[in-house]
């Protein structure tokens, strides 16, 4: 029964979805999505914030590969926002920069929905 958990999308689609959602969370602070996508995006988001805690050329290059333009920021502005405003909040936090809050099933297809948001560093 290994066919049950396969989402039925190509790997390029999954990578692009994660890139879009990571950029949206960094720009807006939170997003509403399905539970499975939120958990998948949370892994990459926490890794990018960990990289952004040390500001050097290599980390900026690696982070830039995962960011996309949003309505508020282009890629360079979003990267500067991450390195100058988001990452310093979590400087002394060893991990757990984001959280997933379950919302319940979506009306229509009963898919489990969730909110992916950045945690505030002062509320441990």
Curated annotation (Swiss-Prot):
Pfam families membership: Ribosomal_L17
GO molecular function annotation: structural constituent of ribosome
Superkingdom to which the source organism belongs: Bacteria
Cellular component, GO annotation: cytosolic large ribosomal subunit
Entry annotated with the keyword Transit peptide: no
UniProt keyword list: Ribonucleoprotein, Ribosomal protein
Signal peptide extent: none
Keyword check for Iron-sulfur: no
InterPro entries in alphabetical order: Ribosomal_bL17 (IPR000456), Ribosomal_bL17_CS (IPR047859), Ribosomal_bL17_sf (IPR036373)
One GO BP annotation of this record: translation
Self-association state and partner proteins as the record states: Part of the 50S ribosomal subunit. Contacts protein L32.
Homology family: Belongs to the bacterial ribosomal protein bL17 family.
Protein's UniProt name: Large ribosomal subunit protein bL17
Species of the source: Mycoplasma pneumoniae (strain ATCC 29342 / M129 / Subtype 1) (Mycoplasmoides pneumoniae)
Taxonomic lineage from the root: Bacteria, Bacillati, Mycoplasmatota, Mycoplasmoidales, Mycoplasmoidaceae
This protein's encoding gene: rplQ
């Amino acid at each position: 029964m290994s066919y049950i958990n396969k989402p039925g999308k190509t790997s390029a689609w999954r990578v692009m979805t994660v890139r879009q959602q990571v950029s949206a969370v960094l720009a807006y602070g939170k997003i509403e999505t399905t539970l499975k996508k939120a958990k998948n995006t949370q892994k990459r988001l926490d890794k990018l914030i960990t990289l952004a805690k040390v500001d050097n050329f290599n980390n900026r290059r690696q982070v830039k590969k995962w960011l996309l333009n949003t309505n508020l920021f282009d890629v360079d502005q979003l990267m500067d926002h991450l390195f100058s405003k988001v990452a310093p909040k979590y400087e002394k936090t060893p991990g757990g920069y984001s959280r997933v809050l379950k919302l319940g099933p979506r009306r229509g297809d009963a898919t489990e929905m969730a909110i992916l948001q950045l945690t505030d560093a002062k509320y441990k």
